[in-house]
Regions:
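Active-site loop segments of alpha/beta catalytic cores
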Residues: 1-117
Length: 117
């Protein structure tokens, strides 16, 4: 399921109805630490915030956001799928192209389950 908005109040009902993956374009509207209450119950498909973080291209801000998403969402039973940035982000949201590679590298570097292998 895709959401560009704040669905925190209805998310438990969506999970109960069978939603198991939520595509988030703007995770900062929740805020991110509140996503932890759903750890192990649903998987979030996300990169970083498509409106507040990615277009600015500030690597320090994006890296902190990625770490927050990993901390809030990752569990042994699932929780996060990294969205790989593509043309939609670069052309539609004005995300600088180098940020795509940066985000992927940050997820690889920070993923707690990749660190175990």
């Amino acid at each position: 399921m895709h959401s560009c908005g704040q669905i925190l109040e209805i998310l438990p009902h969506l999970i109960e109805a069978g939603v198991n993956v939520v595509n988030l374009m703007q995770p900062n509207v929740f805020p991110i630490p509140r996503l932890a209450q759903f750890k192990g119950k649903v998987c979030f498909e996300v990169c970083a915030d498509a409106q507040s973080s990615l277009p600015k291209g500030d690597e320090a801000v994006i890296a902190k956001e990625i770490q927050g998403l990993l901390d809030a969402c990752c569990s042994p039973s699932g929780g996060l799928i990294e969205v790989q940035l593509d043309r939609m982000y670069f052309e539609g949201d004005n995300v600088p192209r180098p940020i795509g590679a940066f985000c992927h590298a940050e997820y690889r570097r920070r993923d707690p389950f990749l660190q175990q292998t």
